[in-house]
Amino acid sequence: MNKDVSLGQPIVRYEDGKLFNTTDQYVTEFPLTIMVNGEEFATVICSPTNLEELVIGFLASEGAILKRDELKSVLIDDSKGFAHVELNKDLGDRFQYSTKRMIASCCGKSREFYFQNDAAIAKTSMSKITLTPMQIINMMTRLQSASHIYQETGGLHNAAISDGLTFFVHRQDIGRHNALDKLYGFCIQRHITVRDKVLIFSGRISSEILIKAAKIGVGVILSKSAPTTLAVTLANDLNITAVGFIRNGGFNIYSHPERIIDSEQ
């Protein structure tokens, strides 16, 4: 059973020249240790929702699995903070001698295989999807309106996958990588093809987020914030359309603008 993603806690607030007691919503940090074939693989600090999706998406992002059929079983014991995964294969030497890792909620830079492993897994997009400006603006508006817990706490990252019209899945997490891993896990579980889908994301498009989008396989990533220079370089190299600063009825296209058409047809 999923735990609460946020909890009300007593605080002291200062406002209008006065101190007073009240309550506020805190986001929950939940450590989940992932065991693969009986061996400790990593501990992820996350929000305690959609944990099976998170585990599957995380393992796929790390290159431990490539498809749903490689999973024999996934058992979540959230009372003890463990995910027990059995694969229909061995992990192989690349993972056998790796050190135990703590993946913090704030970022992904503690990942042992950052860039070396990522380069082998990230996919060059062959997406044929096209979007109109109004589709882009409407998708970001919908993401923000769906993020009620962020509005209460200000502490969660939000992400969704869409075909430009319909949201297939929307997920939230304290960690930006976790939110995307949950989307990835959802799609793997249901054999959803994401080549011609769009990733909508509440945070900045960093190089790590761009690589994550490439691993998932989408052709377009939308964000209300700006990308980094390395993210734009990677987006151009991986044939991904990166759109940022989606706000107040406008946006910037940073790479592969051919997928954005100035027409409502």
UniProtKB/Swiss-Prot annotation:
GO terms for cellular component: cytoplasm. SUPFAM superfamilies: Cytidine deaminase-like (SSF53927). GO terms for biological process: Mo-molybdopterin cofactor biosynthetic process. It is found in: Cytoplasm. Keywords: Cytoplasm, Molybdenum cofactor biosynthesis. Required for formate dehydrogenase (FDH) activity. Acts as a sulfur carrier protein that transfers sulfur from IscS to the molybdenum cofactor prior to its insertion into FDH. This is Sulfur carrier protein FdhD. It comes from Staphylococcus aureus (strain NCTC 8325 / PS 47). The lineage of its organism: Bacteria, Bacillati, Bacillota, Bacilli, Bacillales.
